[in-house]
Structure formats: structure tokens, C-alpha cells
Amino acid sequence: MTDLNLPSIFVPLVGLVFPAIAMTSLFLYVQKNKIV
């Protein structure tokens, strides 16, 4: 459990979570426009 191990796990996690949130926001935005 070193300080170098934390960014190793944290960076890919953010790299996957951030695009997932962006895709979800875009998906909800498109669905809202289709309904209205």
C-alpha cells in the first residue's frame, strides 16, 4: 500500500467513470428531445 499504487487505480477509474457520466447525460438529453 504505497502512494504510487493509489494513482495507478484512481486514474483508470476516473478515465472510465467520467466518459460514462458524459454518455449518460448525452443519452438522457437525446431522449428528452425525442419525447418533446
Curated annotation (Swiss-Prot):
Q: Which UniProt keywords apply?
A: Chloroplast, Membrane, Photosynthesis, Photosystem I, Plastid, Thylakoid, Transmembrane, Transmembrane helix
Q: Name one GO biological process term.
A: photosynthesis
Q: How does it sit in the membrane?
A: Single-pass membrane protein
One GO cellular component term noted in the UniProt record for this chain: photosystem I
Q: Which SUPFAM superfamilies match?
A: Subunit VIII of photosystem I reaction centre, PsaI
Q: Where in the cell is it found?
A: Plastid, Chloroplast thylakoid membrane
InterPro entries per UniProt:
PSI_PsaI, PSI_PsaI_sf
Q: List membrane-spanning regions.
A: 9-29
Family membership noted in the UniProt record: Belongs to the PsaI family.
Instruction: Provide the function of this protein.
Output: May help in the organization of the PsaL subunit.
Q: Which NCBIfam families match?
A: PS_I_psaI
The name on file for this protein is: Photosystem I reaction center subunit VIII
Q: Which organism is it from?
A: Sorghum bicolor (Sorghum)
